[in-house]
């Protein structure tokens, strides 16, 4: 990576956690990712979810159809795990290069997760098959029991689900997605080479005070929810350390404005347009720009056993204002940091 005073040149990054939705929303949001990233792990939580090879092939084609000419972008598809999923279907998709990984959503943990897994025991034959064939498991790491406080769901998941699972299936490759707590940062750092994590820009930049003090900011509301400052600091320190099993995963999750600015608003930040510059700002603030390229472009491919991208992009350090909104067919999208002045942006 070369870093003259105002330009960062890095190998083209990948996004290891992305929601593209479907239909008109998909057509609107895909270009914001495809112009910057070489690849992205695409989440399968559509309605209905992506649970078959055929559904994944069709969804992949809809994504590719939305990629503008001149963008070199490869969507990496995932399978949505359910209690009733056939392990043979999962293995077929993996062997045919359709499924890159499989996603475990605890039932009702987040958007469109009502079909999710009721317990790890219910899908143990599937997980055993994944361990056998070397297929990565992507985990939304929260318990969803009604009696557990929303701010404690990730920490409880580690002790009650994640650690027992990894003790039982010691060769299974696991990505602990969008980690938000010191508990998770410590757990991944202290784990072995088969455990990795992604972190979003919002969890590095903000904590729950930013979302709740002085008024509720619905466009910072996502799941897992922003935590207190000590957790934010632990995440920042983890990425700034150069730890090589944590990598870029935006969890960009678009919802129309009326679904966010509501009496019962949806969870998710549409950060695809601003995420890379946001990460750069955090690394700069932590005096860790020497580790920025690895986080964005190297650590993820290494964990997945994929080649790094062979093209490069540049970020420029000059103040720019983020758009207030982005047009949808019959509504608008509010991007992460809408209307704010940002320090780093991708050079056009």
From Swiss-Prot:
Cellular component terms (Gene Ontology): cytosol
Molecular function terms from GO: dihydroorotase activity; zinc ion binding
Cofactor detail note: Binds 2 Zn(2+) ions per subunit.
Database matches in Pfam families: Amidohydro_1 (PF01979)
Catalytic reaction annotation: (S)-dihydroorotate + H2O = N-carbamoyl-L-aspartate + H(+)
CDD domains to which the protein is assigned, alphabetical: DHOase
Keyword annotations from UniProtKB, A to Z: Hydrolase, Metal-binding, Pyrimidine biosynthesis, Zinc
Name of the protein: Dihydroorotase
Upper lineage: Bacteria, Pseudomonadati, Pseudomonadota, Gammaproteobacteria, Enterobacterales
Gene name of the encoded protein: pyrC
């Amino acid at each position: 990576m070369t870093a003259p005073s105002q330009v960062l040149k890095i190998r083209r990054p990948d996004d290891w956690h992305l929601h593209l939705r479907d239909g008109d929303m998909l057509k609107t949001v895909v270009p914001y990712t495809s112009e910057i990233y070489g690849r992205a792990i695409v989440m399968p939580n559509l309605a209905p979810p992506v649970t078959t090879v055929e559904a994944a092939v069709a969804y992949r084609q809809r994504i590719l159809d939305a990629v503008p000419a001149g963008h070199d972008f490869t969507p990496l598809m995932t399978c949505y795990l359910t209690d009733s999923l056939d392990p043979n279907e999962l293995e077929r998709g993996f062997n045919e290069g359709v499924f890159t990984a499989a996603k475990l959503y605890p039932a009702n943990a987040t958007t469109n997760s009502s079909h999710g897994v009721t317990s790890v025991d219910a899908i143990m034959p599937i997980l055993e098959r994944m361990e056998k064939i070397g297929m990565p498991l992507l985990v939304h790491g929260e318990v969803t029991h009604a009696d557990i406080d929303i701010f404690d769901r990730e920490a409880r998941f580690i002790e009650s689900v994640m650690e027992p699972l990894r003790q039982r299936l010691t060769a299974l490759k696991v990505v602990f997605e969008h980690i938000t707590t010191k508990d998770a940062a410590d757990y991944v750092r202290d784990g072995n080479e088969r455990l990795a994590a992604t972190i979003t820009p919002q969890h590095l930049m903000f904590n729950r005070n930013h979302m709740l003090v002085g008024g509720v900011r619905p466009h910072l509301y996502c799941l897992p929810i922003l935590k207190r400052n000590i957790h934010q600091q632990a995440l920042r320190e983890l990425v700034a350390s150069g730890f090589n099993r944590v990598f870029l995963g935006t969890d960009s999750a678009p919802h129309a404005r009326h679904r966010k600015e509501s009496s019962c608003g949806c969870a998710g930040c549409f950060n695809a347009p601003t995420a890379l510059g946001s990460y750069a700002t955090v690394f700069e603030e932590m005096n860790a720009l020497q580790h920025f390229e690895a986080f964005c472009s190297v650590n993820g491919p290494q964990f997945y056993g994929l080649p790094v991208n062979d093209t490069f992009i540049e970020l420029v350090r000059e103040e720019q204002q983020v758009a207030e909104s982005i047009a949808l067919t019959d509504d608008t999208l509010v991007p992460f940091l809408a209307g704010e002045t940002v320090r780093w942006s991708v050079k056009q």
